[in-house]
């Protein structure tokens, strides 16, 4: 039986350990120290490293982990990452035999051009790095709005009960923005209160689910007329150009400046 262990790091990162009680794979180990501590605490042996993109808070711990464990490193072929043994492209599959874990690889460019996500279909898990967040999405550091929207809609096509293991605890700030973008969304208002209660109790808001994101995350709702209307009223989208890409681009630009 596989499970996912949450390992907080830095100010708001989540590193993920997939394990069976004996063996473990780590997703996006930006810092080796908390990973090594968690492996020791739970008496786990590392057998694989999985990376979603090249940013330092996701790959910074790889070299140190490799000093302790001689394991394969899976990562996107199109992102510049050191120490990669298994470069991956869209449609590839990863098998970690020690865990009997099968992962499908999805190319999700936008945050970075080579960003990938891993889907464990049997378990219903998605490890999406900085592409999809609980209530939000990653900044477009390298990609275009069209690329990011396509990537997000690819993730939104996964089953609604898929658990979303994103890499940051940004949920409350994301949902504050979501309420500005779609103030009449009743499901969103309910979610905001529930997530606030979790944070007040120091409980992670991640994982989310695809179904919850589809009903409350504005970046998965760029085709909703209510959001387009809100952007038009705010002068952020032209009435004559309110297609989903224009709406998504306006949402992302607004979020970048939202306080």
UniProtKB/Swiss-Prot annotation:
GO biological process: methylglyoxal catabolic process to D-lactate via S-lactoyl-glutathione
The entry's keywords: Hydrolase, Metal-binding, Zinc
Binding positions for Zn(2+) 2 per the UniProt entry: 57-58, 130, 168
Domain of life from the UniProt record: Bacteria
Family as reported in the entry's similarity comment: Belongs to the metallo-beta-lactamase superfamily. Glyoxalase II family.
Main function: Thiolesterase that catalyzes the hydrolysis of S-D-lactoyl-glutathione to form glutathione and D-lactic acid.
SUBUNIT field: Monomer.
Name of the protein: Hydroxyacylglutathione hydrolase
Gene (UniProt): gloB
